[in-house]
Swiss-Prot record:
GO biological process: translation
Taxon lineage: Archaea, Thermoproteota, Thermoprotei, Thermoproteales, Thermoproteaceae
InterPro entries recorded: eRP_eS24_sf, Ribosomal_eS24, Ribosomal_uL23/eL15/eS24_sf
Gene: rps24e
The species this protein was found in: Pyrobaculum arsenaticum (strain DSM 13514 / JCM 11321 / PZ6)
Single GO MF annotation: structural constituent of ribosome
Protein name, entry field: Small ribosomal subunit protein eS24
Residues making up the signal peptide according to the UniProt record: none
Origin superkingdom: Archaea
Length: 121
């Protein structure tokens, strides 16, 4: 993260969903777009929260400029995040744990489909 500089440009409180919606501007000249992991750790450190309650929704990089804007959701409780955030966002942010969660859900879905097919016959 030596050539990268992070800056929180906006914070919006969403009391209904018990989260803060944060916009982070990242300047990364002559460097690749920062990873979700690096961004999550930086936001958690800046806001004084646990990394498990920070979820990167999207990172939009402008071509050739070396500037990215990230949309981040910071929850008051990580359990609430697992209920609200879509499965693909959880999988992207949680790494190996997210992949296991995704596989588990896919397996359950396929089992339900099989049961439904058997009932039709």
């Amino acid at each position: 993260m030596s050539a990268e500089s992070f800056n929180i440009s906006a914070i919006r409180e969403n009391k209904l969903l018990a989260r803060r919606e944060v916009l982070v501007e990242v300047s990364h000249h002559k460097a690749p777009t920062p990873t979700r992991k690096d961004l999550r750790e930086w936001v958690a450190k800046q806001l004084g929260v646990d990394v498990s309650s920070v979820f990167i929704r999207k990172i939009k990089t402008e071509y050739g400029i070396g500037k990215s804007v990230a949309e981040v959701h910071v929850y008051s409780d990580s359990k609430m995040a697992r209920i609200i955030e879509p499965l693909y966002i959880l999988a992207r942010n949680l790494g190996e744990e997210g992949k296991k969660l995704l596989e588990e859900v896919k397996k359950k879905r396929s089992e339900r489909r099989e049961k439904k097919r058997k009932r039709k016959k």
